Structures are given as C-alpha cells and as structure tokens.
C-alpha cells in the first residue's frame, strides 16, 4: 500500500521579467499619466514594487505608477520588482499645449510646444518663444514639407514664422550673386518654376500671375533643391537669402519635430499677412491692381500692417524678436519664388496700408524672415 504524504507548502511561481507601458510619454506641466506594470508570467510571485524618478524637478511618480509632470525637461521613471526593472522616458514640454491643438497666433517654443495666444504676458515674455503659428490649414502646406515631417513620424499641423530675423554681419541679403557679380542663373534646370505668367511676352496677366504666386506653397521643396542641387555654390554663399535662412538654425535651432527653418514662398507670405494681420489678399477685391506689365501687383487700404504684426508678438522677449519695419516704415522680404534667371519675388508691406508683390533683380539686398513646418 502506497504511503500518502500531506504538505501545507505552496509552490511559488518565479518572476521572469517586467515591462512598462507606455515606454515614452510627452507631457505638459501639471499633467498626469498612469503607467501600467506587467509582470511575466502574470501569476509570478513578488513582494514589493519600487517606483522612482531620476529627476523629480521634472516629473514625480507615486507608489501606484501615476506620473505627474512638474516642469520642462526630461526624466526617467523606473519600476523595480525583485531583480527586474523597466523604464519610461518622460519629456515635459515648456508650453501649455502641444501641436495637436495649435491655433493661428499661438507662440511656438524652442522645444516644439506652444503657448496659447491668450496666455498672460509675463509667461510669454519668460518663455523661449521662437515663432508664431500663421496657419493650421494643412492644405496650405507644401507637399514636400508634409512628406519630410511624416518621414520623422510627425503628423503635419501647420506653419510658423520666426519672431526674429537672422543677425549675421548684415540684416540684408542678395538672392543670388557670384564673386564676379553674376546674378543670373536658370533655376528651372533643377525644377524651380518661374512665377510670372507669359513673362517672355512682357504682357500684364495679373490674374494668372496672382494665381501662380498665391498657390506657390512649396518653399521647403525649392529651398532643399538649392541646398542639394546647387550645394557647392550654396555653401560658398552665392545664394545669400537661402543660406541666411539655413544658417538661422545656428542662431535659433529648430525643434527636431519640425522641417527646420527655410526661406518662405510668396504664397506662404500671403498667408502670414492674411492670418496674422487680417489682410484680405485676393485678385477680385477693388484694391487689387497691376503696377505694370511685368508681373508686379499690389493692394491698398490694408491698414497699419507692420503695427498689427508687431502686436502679435508684443509680449515676446525683446532679445527673441525683430520688430517689423525695424529698418524704416516699410518691410521688404525675399521669397524663394523665382521669376526669371535673374529675378525673384519679394513681399513688401507698410503702415501706409499697402501690400506689394514685386520682383527684383537677384543682386538687390532685402531682408530675410524664416518659416518652418511642424
């Protein structure tokens, strides 16, 4: 007869590992996020769970895995169970909203977060504001920049214009000029269109030309074409305005989740004035008129455009902005938009109520103000 043995011992299940979800999280100050711990196997035996933050000035965690964002920066949240551990990387942004909730007029910060346009003045002044959102209409973004953002796993949200201009040796830049003063080059060889309907005949087709300029949204694409297809001459400084826009990255680094700074197109400048200054720019209103038979047109009765733009960034710290009309009553900015081998378009506006879309020879020197996609 076999012996029967009775025991009160219960077999323990050995812990084999732990995981955390999510493993990365982006937060705004005062937000909370619950982390979920999973043990393997799920019926493993363990006595205690230890949660810690390596930077409690940025984010704290309680005994249940609830993370609270404190201030801008990064922190690693660690959970330890016996000899096993797992991490969650936390990024806390400086703003009070993220790109998903962007609105025209919001302040774009150096870390890629935003301050709502209604944020109090003191907070805006103390923040590292580098730009202002001028459109959240992704149909007014160039296809190339949307592709560039998606390649970074960033869904396109809109466009930002810089609050300050490049502060290099000069505030003014030519569009293209070689050391021997040659300012003519056919950029259609590398895909840049010429934005003047019927240029060769010198006929004033203002509505057709307006349509070309208004729908010119591929600033990023054509900046990249110059930077890559004309690389040697670009790096040598022949493309003054486009290189100034690229070099602005050194002065004001763009967030990783953006396209980086570039020289805007004429159509993008139209959207800046429409959305930030409240200016209607169409070819059907009574104030639209052709300046001459060479593709130049303008509008009048648009109010104090410079003052309105300055009001948009009134609370940005002085060292982070360049006021409009800082060189006088009128602003003149280069766009990437070529007209012919030796001409490119500029945008001009002033406090006398005029907005101009003109072309100038590429050896003229005008200002540069950059944009980026986010």
Feature names for model-found ranges:
Residues 2-5:
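C-terminal motif of bacterial Sec signal peptides marking the signal peptidase cleavage site
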Residues 7-96:
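Extracytoplasmic soluble-region selector
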Residues 56-60, 132-136, 334:
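Exposed, tryptophan/tyrosine-rich binding patches on extracellular proteins
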Residues 7-9, 93-258, 359-374:
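Short, compositionally biased
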Residues 39, 259-260, 266-270:
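Extracellular/lumenal glycan-associated surfaces
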Residues 9, 266-374:
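C-terminal, surface-exposed recognition/capping segments
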Residues 66-68, 257-263:
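A glycine-rich, coil/turn loop motif that links secondary-structure elements
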């Amino acid at each position: 007869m076999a012996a029967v043995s009775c025991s009160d011992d219960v077999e323990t299940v050995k812990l084999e590992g732990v995981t955390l979800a999510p493993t990365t999280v982006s937060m705004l100050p005062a937000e909370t996020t619950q982390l979920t711990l999973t043990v393997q196997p799920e019926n493993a035996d363990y006595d205690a769970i230890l949660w810690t933050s390596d930077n409690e000035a940025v984010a704290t965690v309680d005994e249940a895995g609830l993370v609270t964002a404190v201030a801008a920066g990064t922190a690693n949240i660690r959970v330890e169970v016996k000899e096993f551990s797992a991490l969650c990387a936390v990024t806390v942004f400086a703003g009070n909203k993220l790109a998903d909730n962007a609105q025209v007029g919001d302040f774009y910060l150096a870390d890629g977060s935003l301050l709502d346009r209604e944020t109090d003045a003191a907070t805006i002044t103390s923040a590292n504001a580098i730009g202002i959102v001028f459109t959240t209409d992704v149909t007014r973004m160039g296809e190339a920049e949307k592709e560039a953002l998606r390649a970074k796993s960033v869904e396109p949200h809109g466009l930002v214009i810089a609050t300050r201009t490049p502060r290099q040796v000069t505030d003014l830049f030519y569009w293209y000029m070689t050391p021997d003063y040659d300012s003519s080059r056919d950029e259609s060889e590398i895909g840049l269109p010429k934005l003047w309907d019927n240029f060769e005949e010198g006929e004033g087709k203002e509505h057709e030309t307006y349509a070309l300029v208004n729908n010119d949204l591929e600033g990023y694409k054509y900046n990249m074409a110059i930077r890559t297809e004309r690389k040697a001459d670009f790096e040598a400084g022949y493309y003054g305005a486009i290189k100034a826009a690229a070099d602005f990255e050194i002065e004001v680094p763009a967030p990783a989740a953006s396209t980086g700074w570039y020289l805007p197109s004429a159509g993008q400048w139209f959207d800046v004035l429409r959305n930030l200054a409240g200016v209607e720019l169409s070819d059907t209103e009574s104030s639209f008129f052709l300046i001459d038979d060479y593709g130049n047109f303008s509008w009048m009765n648009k109010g104090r455009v410079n003052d309105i733009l300055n009001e948009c960034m009134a609370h940005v710290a002085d060292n982070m902005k360049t006021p409009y009309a800082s060189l006088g009553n009128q602003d003149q900015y280069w766009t990437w938009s070529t007209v012919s081998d030796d001409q490119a378009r500029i945008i001009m506006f002033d406090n006398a109520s005029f907005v101009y879309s003109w072309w100038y020879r590429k050896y003229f020197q005008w200002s540069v103000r950059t944009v980026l996609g986010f």
